[in-house]
């Protein structure tokens, strides 16, 4: 299975368009979104071309490919405009490895929910990384729209971070 992992769109119509381009270029089986889809949050600047309804329209057009976890900026009202399900987390096996996908505000490299996985991928911190710790692999795709700490706009494909 080929998957693309994207996090922290924060309502950017501009970067939602980039997701369409990524889908066309990579042609993944699944696009895994790690939360914070529409709202920018009180601590973030407005994202480029802040248009949450445009983001919803684009994501809804990709609904058959989407697996989505709920972020700390996602609310019940966001689910009303979405034609896909928001999950607290996603567990799946890919190529014999157990993956745990979450937003990252509750569970992350510093706060592991349990140990029945091989790889944990989470968003929230807006900085991409891949790191091994205590026999587990932890990865973060960074933020597609609002990278922090001088990091680049990024996502994960084939479980490698792609900067653009």
Predicted regions and their residues:
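Core catalytic region of metal-dependent phosphoesterases/phosphodiesterases
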Residues: 2-94
């Amino acid at each position: 299975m080929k998957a693309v992992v994207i996090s922290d769109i924060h309502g950017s119509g501009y970067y939602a368009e980039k997701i369409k381009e990524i889908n066309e270029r990579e042609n993944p089986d699944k696009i895994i979104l790690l939360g914070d889809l529409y709202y920018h949050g009180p601590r973030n600047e407005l994202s480029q071309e802040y248009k949450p309804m445009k983001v919803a329209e684009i994501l809804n057009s990709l609904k058959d490919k989407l697996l989505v976890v709920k972020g700390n900026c996602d609310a019940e009202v966001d689910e009303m405009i979405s034609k896909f399900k928001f999950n607290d987390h996603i567990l799946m096996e890919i190529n014999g490895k157990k993956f745990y996908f979450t937003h990252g505000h509750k569970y992350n490299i510093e706060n592991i929910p349990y140990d029945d996985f091989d790889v944990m991928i989470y968003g929230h911190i807006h900085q991409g990384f891949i790191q091994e710790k205590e026999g587990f692999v932890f990865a973060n795709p960074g933020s597609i729209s609002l990278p922090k700490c001088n990091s680049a706009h990024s996502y994960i494909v084939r479980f490698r971070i792609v900067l653009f």
